[in-house]
Amino acid sequence: MALVVKGKVNINEFIDLTKMEKILPSMFTPVKRVMCSKVDKIMVHENESLSEVNLLKGVKLIDSGYVCLAGLVVTGEWNLPDNCRGGVSVCLVDKRMERADEATLGSYYTAAAKKRFQFKVVPNYAITTQDAMKNVWQVLVNIRNVKMSAGFCPLSLEFVSVCIVYRNNIKLGLREKITNVRDGGPMELTEEVVDEFMEDVPMSIRLAKFRSRTGKKSDVRKGKNSSSDRSVPNKNYRNVKDFGGMSLKKNNLIDDDSEATVAESDSF
């Protein structure tokens, strides 16, 4: 859904921060940094086009983090005389989504007689930094009944976004209330019983199965290595045993001290 707006970009129109979020340090709130992007422009030359648009232009992203597209302001300028007929439809598209109805984030229609127009879209969803760097947003423009010779630009579009950049979804300390609604209604758990709660979560069963599968694959690889390296001295064989298989894979899990340090740090 798109709504007409006037004037400059107002962050408060897209993000409603509570008093606690304004007062507390960033480590105690999921809102880390609110930013406005630089202006990105599209010069429309064809009656129907699907163009790439950089909605995060000038926004400093965080490695292995997230960015939430809270809002978008679109300004259009008709490069036509005042008495022209016709109009245009502008639609914001998320090109990752394969279903067309799910890919369209907001649309707007206006007549060519209105020289300048402006509207806002409120996507209000987050993507990973890795996806954001792939420039996942597009703009579908459909100009109708505007008679202009080919090669000229009847319409110019400018885009400015309001976004939230943050490193982690979870708050430090796990002092949030965790609700278990599977049996007998809500149950509030404190920090002391988080581990016990995790054992009851179905995802822990999936994780156990996943680790058992990776463990079996690792054992098979160990067997192949030991059979192929029988002529290798014992010292080299111990090195293969100590640094191969599951011990290497374990460094990629959350048990890694370096990963835990990054997750617990809160620079933003």
Swiss-Prot record:
A Gene Ontology cellular-component term? host cell cytoplasm
Quote the subcellular location field of this record.
Host cytoplasm, Host cytoskeleton; Host cell junction, Host plasmodesma
Query: Which GO terms of the molecular function aspect are on file?
Result: double-stranded DNA binding; RNA binding
What keywords are assigned to this protein? Host cell junction, Host cytoplasm, Host cytoskeleton, Host-virus interaction, RNA-binding, Transport, Viral movement protein
Region described as Disordered? 215-243
The highest taxon in the source lineage is Viruses
Annotated Polar residues bias:
225-237
Q: Which GO terms describe its biological process?
A: transport of virus in host, cell to cell
Report the protein's function.
Transports viral genome to neighboring plant cells directly through plasmosdesmata, without any budding. The movement protein allows efficient cell to cell propagation, by bypassing the host cell wall barrier. Forms a ribonucleoprotein complex with viral RNA. Binds microtubules and modulates microtubule stability. Can bind double-stranded DNA. Triggers host hypersensitive defense reaction in incompatible plants harboring resistance (R) proteins.
Q: Which family does it belong to?
A: Belongs to the tobamovirus movement protein family.
- Quaternary context: Binds to host RBCS at the plasmodesmata; this interaction seems required for viral systemic movement. In resistant plants, interacts with host MBP2C at host microtubules; this interaction prevents virus cell to cell movement. In resistant plants, interacts with host resistance (R) protein (e.g. tomato ToMV resistance protein TM-2(2), AC Q71BG9) at the host plasma membrane; this interaction triggers host defense responses leading to programmed cell death.
Name by which UniProt lists this protein:
Movement protein
Q: Organism classification, top ranks?
A: Viruses, Riboviria, Orthornavirae, Kitrinoviricota, Alsuviricetes
